[in-house]
Amino acid sequence: MEIKPVEVIDGVPVFKPSMMEFANFQYFIDEITKFGIENGIVKVIPPKEWLELLEGSPPAESLKTIQLDSPIQQQAKRWDKHENGVFSIENEYDNKSYNLTQWKNLAESLDSRISQGDFNDKTLKENCRVDSQQDCYDLAQLQILESDFWKTIAFSKPFYAVDENSSIFPYDLTLWNLNNLPDSINSSNRRLLTGQSKCIFPWHLDEQNKCSINYLHFGAPKQWYSIPSANTDQFLKILSKEPSSNKENCPAFIRHQNIITSPDFLRKNNIKFNRVVQFQHEFIITFPYCMYSGFNYGYNFGESIEFILDQQAVVRKQPLKCGCGNKKEERKSGPFSNLSYDSNESEQRGSITDNDNDLFQKVRSFDELLNHSSQELQNLEDNKNPLFSNINMNRPQSSSLRSTTPNGVNQFLNMNQTTISRISSPLLSRMMDLSNIVEPTLDDPGSKFKRKVLTPQLPQMNIPSNSSNFGTPSLTNTNSLLSNITATSTNPSTTTNGSQNHNNVNANGINTSAAASINNNISSTNNSANNSSSNNNVSTVPSSMMHSSTLNGTSGLGGDNDDNMLALSLATLANSATASPRLTLPPLSSPMNPNGHTSYNGNMMNNNSGNGSNGSNSYSNGVTTAAATTTSAPHNLSIVSPNPTYSPNPLSLYLTNSKNPLNSGLAPLSPSTSNIPFLKRNNVVTLNISREASKSPISSFVNDYRSPLGVSNPLMYSSTINDYSNGTGIRQNSNNINPLDAGPSFSPLHKKPKILNGNDNSNLDSNNFDYSFTGNKQESNPSILNNNTNNNDNYRTSSMNNNGNNYQAHSSKFGENEVIMSDHGKIYICRECNRQFSSGHHLTRHKKSVHSGEKPHSCPRCGKRFKRRDHVLQHLNKKIPCTQEMENTKLAES
């Protein structure tokens, strides 16, 4: 059934479809397209059945959601001094935000008679009804208003605004709901449009096969002007002749949408145009390559959306693309920005040179680097190197911890295959990706980056656990160590101390021939390492950190590859456990000293209570030295070194246990297959940013790990989940756990221990303080202090004397119900007035100034007392004489 217009008003077809014709959106658009392309725009009056579906619309709930941000004030200016009927529109943005009621008051240029408190449903409905408008529009009056508009266009500054997040259509409306068109309709750029009287929408020129639907919900009518697509080129040619068209700078000046012309100008230049008035509850549909403009007769509210026309009705004309910064289309977001037809597109694509393709590949490769994980890029690298495709197939970093649900929970608890991924931050994760794939170098000044080549992993050097002497070779004797390692890795058997070892294998199946060849070198340098000064850096260099050229003897220690400090530092910050409180750290049972003691200035202190590190270090005068061991070393200690022994991964700063590295209970390592060669030198200093002091107890994981750099600061809390520090996965003394077992430093109600300077060594009852909760306050319980100190039902801390500093725990000034933990941190609540504060300082000040009867501040003149100091200043600044001055004045008068 063919759909025809019921009438044509000033060249614009007007359709009044039946409900059956109107119900099929796609069919109706296909039928009226031929009329729209010929005339530019059409007017559609919906049937009464559809209007009945809008009964009671718009609802008050939808009107409340409308928020008009940064409306635009328009100013029309003539192109030249002559009255030629061509105007340019300048926009000025307002930084204010309005709701619908405030916007109507602004539109009427009246005082804000409706306050924010009157923003209720009744007020909204009254301001959105058409019969509440003061003017009743008829054709005769509209002609007078149109003539008045063009006479005063240069003297008015109307506002208009756009809301792209709201819609007034009922959500359950399925027919012609611009907020919910059928999925088969490719639509975009839906928005609410509202404007004041004489608000202007300049000449628009839509792209090929793009249409727009405009619906007027309520308010004053709109005046529309349109130029059919057949006359668009003529109109653009005439406008380009105007001196102010700025065609020399931008041939597509019409795309700026800042030009409007009067009907007299169009008649004078013999340009065919159409005109129509849009009333409320009517649709205006524009078609491709036609031009349209208009203005508002008063305050109104409409909604519009763009959609793609059927390809069979495409107009084979495409407007020019604007390339300057004033192009308005570039600021629009939608799926149709690249769907326009260009006749020269195939020729332009055919003229692309090979150099352009190479440049595109380079940009694409770098874009992939920034938008893909290091695992994906490493897989690409493995595929490019088939010789090493079978090496390290079970990559531990393949299970990324970036998701909220970790992969392989059992494996994570066993600390076998999980590595520290990129929990720190997205920025540090990208830094880690760059450090894994791109190696910065200073050798070639012409290129800032160079690709890395995978090198096979060299065997690790392992020290047998039954060795009697332990030490660390200094960097001055590393060349001999490197030569021994090279000989060990290349020869199946090695002669040590005049005897030949044929692939010696210990009970664990680990080849110890390399360790045996190194044992003498370590023993010879052990005493010198223990007695060295702080100027001698003591470290161990694993074989995986040595470059192939160094191992082959072509270059000494620190060859061409020690310039990659930037990549190492960035990856270290991204993977270091000390850089994020949420990451697991090395276990409390540090291999530094397994005896469970820590030495401070020669004083041994037992930390078996769980609050200190189970490991031990010896510190003398601030200089760290290797702990000298006696006849035999424990079985769980392989290397004793004051500095952390590097793992085979050069990007890790954790201690390694060479006896059983897979089941040692250490913290997960950062990507263990990284192949960045790095040699540690005396004159190289790496930056380590630690947030150990700010470790949040809420973000603590299953295990309590500590960085090897923070052994001197024992943990003041114990995990409340499980304790795996003993390697068994079973918490000791689990029957003594109580809800307050976290300790004072763990609880958010306690502050950090206060440091008291001086040599005050006086402590109460063996430096133990016990606290019990009574209501909302923490009070010291003398009876508990005199009882057994092993009572686990109360808080207990210890005071440590270290270099004259006493660490003493003290109670918080806030009650338990005054501090609430939320997702954003602590919230302090005043229990008297229920006000919330972001810090304890504000809560304390609020209590003193509002709820406290104390008045500590007094006026220096009259002695009047006030609660706050600023109240005294306000009192003094007032030109009111003080009490004492008034008394002196009365005495003088008498």
From Swiss-Prot:
Motif Bipartite nuclear localization signal, residue numbers: 316-332
GO MF annotations, alphabetized: DNA-binding transcription repressor activity, RNA polymerase II-specific; histone H3K36 demethylase activity; histone H3K9 demethylase activity; RNA polymerase II cis-regulatory region sequence-specific DNA binding; zinc ion binding
Cellular localization per UniProt: Nucleus
Coiled-coil portions: 90-110, 361-385
Keyword terms of this UniProt record: Activator, Coiled coil, DNA-binding, Metal-binding, Nucleus, Phosphoprotein, Repeat, Repressor, Transcription, Transcription regulation, Zinc, Zinc-finger
Gene Ontology BP annotations: chromatin remodeling; negative regulation of transcription by RNA polymerase II; positive regulation of transcription by RNA polymerase II; regulation of gene expression; regulation of phospholipid biosynthetic process
Pfam families: JmjC, JmjN, zf-C2H2
Extra facts: Present with 432 molecules/cell in log phase SD medium.
The protein's name: Transcriptional activator/repressor GIS1
Gene field: GIS1
